[in-house]
Amino acid sequence: MGLLVFVRNLLLALCLFLVLGFLYYSAWKLHLLQWEDSNSLLLSLDSAGQTLGTEYDRLGFLLKLDSKLPAELATKYANFSEGACKPGYASAMMTAIFPRFSKPAPMFLDDSFRKWARIREFVPPFGIKGQDNLIKAILSVTKEYRLTPALDSLHCRRCIIVGNGGVLANKSLGSRIDDYDIVIRLNSAPVKGFERDVGSKTTLRITYPEGAMQRPEQYERDSLFVLAGFKWQDFKWLKYIVYKERVSASDGFWKSVATRVPKEPPEIRILNPYFIQEAAFTLIGLPFNNGLMGRGNIPTLGSVAVTMALHGCDEVAVAGFGYDMNTPNAPLHYYETVRMAAIKESWTHNIQREKEFLRKLVKARVITDLSSGI
């Protein structure tokens, strides 16, 4: 009888030990996962390329780039006729030269924006921290978070980002630009009077308050107005615009801003700030600066738009991109007389780093450069 009691007590003690051990392991594992979740982005920013081997650069891009399609992609697209849209082409080519690339990001913020950790922990321009109420108020009125139904239904989307560079002048690329399904324009770059070189079609116009066109008649019909929020005042400004409230010109802007945008709320979108974050830290390698806006760590709107297009388009092209610092007297933009030397005065952008990033994409045929400025 005593032996049975001893065996029973031994088994109970063993079971208790196993249960405690399991609970301890589970708690440790949960803590580890939580730590990994909260630090994975920072780790990826600090150690990009270090675990990929010597064939990749410090950011994680393939060092030896050429225009030859990888074998599996050459097979996949072998039967496509010249000029036919190739589904998934841009993201597949991007992944081939940059294995860390993935497509988790929607183009625009929707009503689930607070659930996405990648932008929740950063203040503008790299995230939405502190902007919940403003964004919620805007989205409650716009109620549209995607492209138009016609564009959303396309089996394959060909997109072009039209930059503002002087390299567009006298190139006569207008008809080729208009052939794309989605034509993305930036800030206040005009179309009227320049159609021969820049086309007449506009699908999206991405801007921030200081860059937005100030005269209502300049806005194109049938285009979406997309805010790129670089500071909290930008979201406040958009709320004024959407609710048709009075805009104060002294609300923290560095120049005068539009007081009215002739778009109905369903024609207005908020660009997902993840693309600003990804362009800056992951793809271009700008200084992290604790996730805050600082000197030389803000990507140009052109690079942000390219990053967005890599996520949302099957094929991506650009036109009007490229700054040639060796020609300081060349026109900076196709529509004005400001000279190239003016870009050197910018303290927020790192033009050389951006040029290196875009050249990688062009060389590897991830994107097409119609104006050959990159």
Swiss-Prot record:
The chain crosses the membrane at residues 9-28. Catalyzes the formation of the NeuAc-alpha-2,3-Gal-beta-1,4-GlcNAc-, NeuAc-alpha-2,3-Gal-beta-1,3-GlcNAc- and NeuAc-alpha-2,3-Gal-beta-1,3-GalNAc- sequences found in terminal carbohydrate groups of glycoproteins and glycolipids. The highest activity is toward Gal-beta-1,3-GlcNAc and the lowest toward Gal-beta-1,3-GalNAc. Residues 29-374 are lumenal. PANTHER family: CMP-N-ACETYLNEURAMINATE-BETA-1,4-GALACTOSIDE ALPHA-2,3-SIALYLTRANSFERASE, SIALYLTRANSFERASE. Residues 1-8 are cytoplasmic. Pathway: Protein modification; protein glycosylation. Disulfide bonds join C159-C313. GO terms for cellular component: Golgi cisterna membrane. CDD domains: GT29_ST3GAL3. Optimum pH is 6.4. Glycans are attached at N79, N170. It is an enzyme of class 2 (transferase). It holds the Pfam family Glyco_transf_29. GO terms for molecular function: beta-galactoside (CMP) alpha-2,3-sialyltransferase activity; N-acetyllactosaminide alpha-2,3-sialyltransferase activity. It is a single-pass type II membrane protein. It comes from the Eukaryota. GO terms for biological process: ganglioside biosynthetic process via lactosylceramide; protein glycosylation. This is CMP-N-acetylneuraminate-beta-1,4-galactoside alpha-2,3-sialyltransferase. Belongs to the glycosyltransferase 29 family. Found in all tissues tested. High expression found in brain, liver, kidney, colon, heart and spleen. Its EC number is 2.4.3.6. It catalyses: a beta-D-galactosyl-(1->4)-N-acetyl-beta-D-glucosaminyl derivative + CMP-N-acetyl-beta-neuraminate = an N-acetyl-alpha-neuraminyl-(2->3)-beta-D-galactosyl-(1->4)-N-acetyl-beta-D-glucosaminyl derivative + CMP + H(+). The keyword Transmembrane applies.
